[in-house]
Amino acid sequence: MSLLRNRLQDLPALCLCVLVLACIGACQSEAYEGTPSPPPKLKMSHWSLVTGRMKELLEPVVNRTRDRWQWFWSPSTFRGFMQTYYDDHLRDLGPRTKAWLLKSKESLLNKTHSLCPRIVCGDKDQG
């Protein structure tokens, strides 16, 4: 128990140290913001090598896929797709949303009223 009491007495000093360290860290990060980054040759790390290799492997695949799907992104095809999607899914979105909200509201009110006598009001039969 005395160990816990000693630690509680040291808590304000510990908080002060943490606050001072946080301020020092913030001041140092502000000081480093204006310094230029190291040249790219000095920046090379294992992760940058992995990233470079992945980019090297995936770039041809991405380019081939982009070339194959180029027909889809032409204005007439894309416009047709969007018009069909709108007609199928979004044209009556406003009325459907309003109906869903009203139904959800009624359902929630019914559940609330059914719970009220048991929780808040007690049973009406025991009056």
UniProtKB/Swiss-Prot annotation:
Residues 1-27 form the signal peptide. It is found in: Secreted. InterPro entries: APOC4. It comes from Chlorocebus sabaeus. May participate in lipoprotein metabolism. It holds the Pfam family APOC4. Belongs to the apolipoprotein C4 family. One of its GO terms (biological process) is triglyceride homeostasis. Keywords: Lipid transport, Secreted, Signal, Transport. This is Apolipoprotein C-IV. Its main location: secreted. GO terms for cellular component: high-density lipoprotein particle; very-low-density lipoprotein particle. The keyword Transferase does not apply.
